[in-house]
Design a protein with these regions (language model features):
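Low-complexity, Gly/Ser/Thr/Pro-rich intrinsically disordered linker/tail segments
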Residues: 425-506
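Structural signature of tandem-repeat unit edges
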Residues: 1-5, 15-28, 38-50, 57-70, ...
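Hydrophobic/aromatic-rich core segments of domains that either
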Residues: 352-428
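Secondary-structure boundary elements
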Residues: 258-345
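TPR/TPR-like alpha-solenoid helical repeat scaffolds
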Residues: 221-241
Length: 506
């Protein structure tokens, strides 16, 4: 059918597929949609709104993947001019134009909320984009300038500006359409800010209308709406209260976690998690390269585990916006790249480096990806380490991104599952006093545990095999196991509801 969304692992292991031809319009293709389709040779898509990272992977027989329609105006030899009437919610980008040899002008007659427009390809007569209105946000300002700092829209000016876009969004919904994910992400905050502006002026009807749009577009910052003084006059308004409750259902992360279904036993035979021994030649090399024995020190096991984490926290800064490192995905290569380029690593790669350091020292360890209930739209996950303490006979939480670990009220170190359970039950948690982000921002229990990690402890996953280069750059890593609340996903070879299985001792 038209306008389908091909979800994660949608055709996983469908060995009967040899060729797939999609209709004219596809909403999106998600990670691993065709993974394991051993006979699939040809994929053909036309207009596709979104292709996820990892959408096309582990397809051993595929010979051709064809994507047509990604350029909106292409191969139109007689086209001279394009006019957009009215306001534009978003353009996507960067390539709108290609292979139009007579094209001279593209004119936007109204305002643009967000644009990613860049250079035209093979359009020798093209003079550039003309925008007769205002552009609130432009990713490529050399091609489409946005409002200057002096013109920055605030208060009533922003409210009036966003009011011109509200009918566009409502019209899309009225016709059964949807606003694409990236447009939701860019437009929801602006509608919320305009709602606040209307509320500050006592324009309740406009404020509630814009707040409703912001929420439908994905606004989920419960703390903002709960604490915003501009909403004080509306606190007793039933319509406002209903809207706040909608935000709470997705944005009050501790509330969402507490409402999650419980885990339960999974009687299926599942493979054991494994840990590469420190005698492996690559791990021996890691131990020698970093001089890990010196870093760990001569203290007891817990002090050694902490020392390794603290050393990495200081050696490589956390940079959540950094891309994938262009090197082999092992601790030595990533460390050398960071020193050579003066760059940092995001939480995933920091956790991979720490994982190899722990394994090299003989501490069984996994890096655990922690994700929110809205994992399919929320890209802000977090990755930490769980390392086995023989001294305590249990897993413990170590986070090199924030130099963080967690204990109960008696000082007992906890693992991610125990932290999750205590958040749900409202039991005491203690974050180490020196937890911090790059020695710039102190971390608190309220911010780090009760907000950020409460959001990201809804769903957990880890690789079955923990080893040197657990996630190679070619994507050939071992299978991942997801621990999810009962009923959140169907049980599969990848998903379990059994927390005891997931936290099994090495």
């Amino acid at each position: 059918p038209e306008n389908v969304f091909v979800g994660a692992s949608a055709f996983y292991g469908s060995n009967e597929l040899a060729e797939v031809v999609f209709p004219r319009q596809v909403r999106g293709v998600w990670k691993g949609a065709f993974e394991g389709c051993a006979q699939l040779k040809t994929l053909s898509l036309n207009h596709v709104d979104f292709i996820s990272g990892g959408a096309f992977q582990k397809m051993p027989a595929v010979e051709r993947i064809e994507v047509n329609g990604w350029r909106t105006f292409a191969e139109c030899p007689q086209l001279k001019r394009v006019d957009f009437r009215g306001v534009v919610l978003g353009t996507g980008g960067p390539t709108l134009l290609a292979d139009c040899p007579r094209l001279e002008q593209v004119v936007f007659h109204g305002d643009i909320l967000s644009t990613g427009l860049g250079a035209a390809e093979h359009c020798p007569l093209f003079e550039g984009y003309t925008v007769k209105g205002k552009v609130l946000r432009s990713q490529h300002k050399d091609f489409v300038p946005q409002v200057s700092d002096e013109e920055r829209l605030e208060g009533r000016g922003l409210a009036d500006f966003m009011s011109r876009f509200a009918p566009v969004v409502r019209r899309i919904w009225a016709h059964g359409g949807g606003v694409m994910g990236y447009m939701k992400k860019t437009s929801a905050p602006w509608f919320y800010r305009s709602a606040c502006a209307w509320a500050s002026e006592g324009r309740d009807e406009e404020a509630l209308a814009h707040l409703d749009i912001a929420i439908k577009l994905g606004f989920a910052k419960y703390d903002l709406i709960k604490g915003g003084k501009e909403w004080d006059a509306l606190r007793e308004n039933p319509e406002f209260q209903a809207l706040v409750e909608k935000v709470r259902e997705v944005g009050d992360y501790l509330y969402v976690l507490k409402k999650s279904p419980a885990y339960r036993e999974d009687a299926r035979p599942m493979p054991a998690f494994t840990y590469q021994p420190p005698t492996d030649s690559n791990l021996v090399r890691v131990r020698r390269y970093f001089n890990l024995d010196s870093i760990a020190g001569d203290g007891d096991e817990i002090s050694q585990i902490k020392n390794l984490m603290y050393w990495l926290h200081d050696a490589i800064r956390h940079d959540g916006g950094s891309g994938r490192p262009d090197c082999a995905r092992n601790s030595i290569a990533m460390y050398e790249l960071c020193k050579r380029e003066g760059r940092g690593l995001n939480c995933r790669f920091l956790a991979q480096v720490l994982n190899e350091m722990y394994l090299a020292m003989g501490f069984p360890s996994r890096f655990v990806t922690c994700q929110s209930k809205a994992y399919d739209t929320d890209t802000d996950c977090h990755v930490i380490n769980m390392v086995w303490s023989r001294q305590l006979g249990k897993w413990i939480w170590m986070d090199a991104s924030f130099a963080a670990y967690v204990t109960d009220e008696n000082g007992l170190l906890l693992h991610p599952g125990e932290v999750r359970e205590r958040l749900i039950k409202g039991l005491p948690l203690v974050l180490n006093e020196d937890a911090n982000w790059n020695h710039k921002t102190k971390q608190t229990k309220e911010g780090y545990l009760e907000n950020y990690m409460a959001k990201n402890l809804y769903m957990l996953d880890a690789h079955l095999e923990s080893r040197f280069e657990t996630e190679p750059a070619d994507g050939s890593g071992s299978r991942q196991i997801y621990l999810v609340p009962e009923g959140f996903w169907p049980l599969s070879e990848y998903a379990t509801y059994d927390d005891r299985y997931f936290w099994q001792a090495p």
